[in-house]
A protein has these predicted regions:
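Domain-core detector
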Residues: 1-165, 173-230
């Protein structure tokens, strides 16, 4: 995207990310809430709107932004022009940012996921590392995942694959076995957790509410059978 907004430069626009958005089906928020998490990965909605024409216009503008490298401002200007012409209140900057960032990040990460789960790539780069933006705005639970390395087929990625909340800036990078060994980081085998020392209870940490799933995997369903990182 222009100005490398949210890390989505033109060099990182995957055709799979565009396809991920274009395959989505528009639903009202009430209809969306009735779906299971796997089905939600293939659906699209924006709270506050029930018109299919409006919802489809949102989706079309997001798809165009992903495909053509448009910015959040382009998206907001185009949507507000449409909304105001049709008797709706325009988007404020905060809502435009949430809609744009969440959908662009989800699409980008879906495209990235498909790339990383290519059989050849999986064989060469069989480990994945979770990374955050590394600043003071990173959520506590997300920060607990920073730098953790897991096998690419570890079930953790069914829960902790970004985005893991609204406006989440986390990402995942693939690694070779040699890179993992050089990093000196032990491969994790469990989700992050806290221990209540007064009771000894282990409390596993999860993504933000509504984000404990992997929409990329639900959309692409890679075949991980027979995968061996060794």
């Amino acid at each position: 995207m222009k100005n490398a907004e949210y890390g989505l430069t033109e060099n990182l626009i995957f055709k799979e990310a565009v396809a991920f958005l274009k395959k989505k089906k528009t639903l009202t928020a009430d209809e969306y809430k009735l779906l299971d998490e796997e089905s939600r990965a293939k659906a699209f909605t924006v709270s506050g709107y029930t018109s299919m024409e409006v919802l489809q216009t949102f989706l079309n503008e997001l798809s165009d932004a992903c495909e053509q490298g448009k910015t959040k401002k382009d998206f907001m200007d185009n949507m507000n022009d449409f909304l105001l012409r049709n008797g709706y209140t325009g988007l404020n900057p905060f809502k435009a940012d949430v809609i744009f960032r969440t959908n662009m990040q989800t699409a980008y990460n879906a495209g990235h996921y498909k790339s990383m789960t290519d059989p050849t790539t999986m064989k060469l780069r069989p480990y994945w590392k979770y990374t955050t933006a590394g600043d003071g705005q990173v959520r506590e639970t997300h920060a607990m995942m920073e730098g953790r390395i897991y096998r690419a087929d570890d079930p953790i990625w069914d829960i902790w694959y970004p985005p893991n909340g609204f406006r989440c800036r986390c990402s995942v990078v693939s690694m070779t076995k040699a890179q993992v060994e050089r990093s000196g980081v032990e491969v994790s085998k469990s989700a992050p957790y806290d221990i209540d020392f007064s009771t000894g209870e282990i409390k596993y940490r999860f993504p933000d509410k509504g984000f404990s799933n992997n929409p990329a995997k639900s959309a692409w369903k890679p075949d991980l059978s027979g995968f061996d990182p060794a």
